[in-house]
């Protein structure tokens, strides 16, 4: 999924320190960090801090080796650090501070049709609120679906800048939070553009190409913006 080269093996506890890598999703790069297993007696404070600051958590379980136990142990470890799945917030008391994160359960070793049937059973037996993605690291099955699921759950959009009289550069989008406005996009292009912005024209989600839009117009994924200052 990334060009990182952590040590891998067909047994647990291979990863001993966080290893970053960049995962391409269409025309953007998303950083993934391979962490040590969470089912250990001691977790370094640096690792817990990393987990609290991340935008999203992927819990990898082995379908062929007690996946329920793996998930339960990982979730319990995260709970001890105050980290919970944002879709399961109503399962927890509101008398403490929680770090809420979107969490995907990535189920590895779905290598053939038999394992895919086991995956379906695994999902059916889980309590509500969990999103599970089947993959096979051996065959590559499900990797594209996982990438799309990560993009969707990050809740981000890609917006392209266009200079007057030129075509938009669609190779290097600006990545913004979903719900971002034209004004927020201008600030990402350059901090001075917010105060100096006179007009903005939009191609994409507008009623017609090149439509003038206001500063508070909410952008959509794939929009092209031409700013005039």
Q: Language model features by range: what are they?
A:
Residues 22-30, 40-134:
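Conserved C-terminal guanine-recognition region of P-loop GTPase G domains, centered on the G4
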């Amino acid at each position: 999924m990334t060009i990182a080269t952590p040590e891998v093996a067909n047994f647990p506890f291979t990863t001993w320190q966080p290893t970053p890598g960049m995962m391409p999703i269409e025309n953007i790069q998303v950083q993934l960090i391979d962490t040590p297993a969470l089912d250990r007696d001691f977790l370094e404070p640096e690792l817990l801090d990393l987990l609290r600051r991340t935008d999203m958590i992927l819990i990898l379980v082995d379908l062929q080796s007690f996946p329920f136990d793996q998930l339960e142990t990982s979730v319990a470890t995260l709970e001890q650090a105050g980290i919970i799945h944002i879709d399961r917030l109503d399962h927890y008391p509101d008398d403490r501070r929680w770090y809420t994160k979107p969490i995907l359960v990535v189920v590895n070793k779905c290598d053939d049709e038999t394992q895919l049937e086991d995956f379906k059973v695994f999902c059916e037996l889980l309590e509500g609120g969990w999103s599970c993605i089947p993959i096979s690291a051996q065959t590559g099955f499900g990797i594209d679906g996982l990438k799309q699921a990560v993009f969707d759950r990050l809740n981000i959009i890609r917006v392209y800048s266009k200079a007057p009289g030129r075509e938009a550069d669609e190779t290097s989008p600006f990545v913004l939070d979903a719900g971002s406005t034209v004004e927020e996009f201008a600030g990402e292009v350059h901090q001075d553009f917010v105060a100096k912005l006179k007009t903005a024209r939009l191609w994409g989600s507008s009623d017609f190409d090149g439509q003038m839009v206001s500063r508070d117009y909410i952008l959509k994924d794939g929009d092209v913006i031409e700013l005039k200052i």
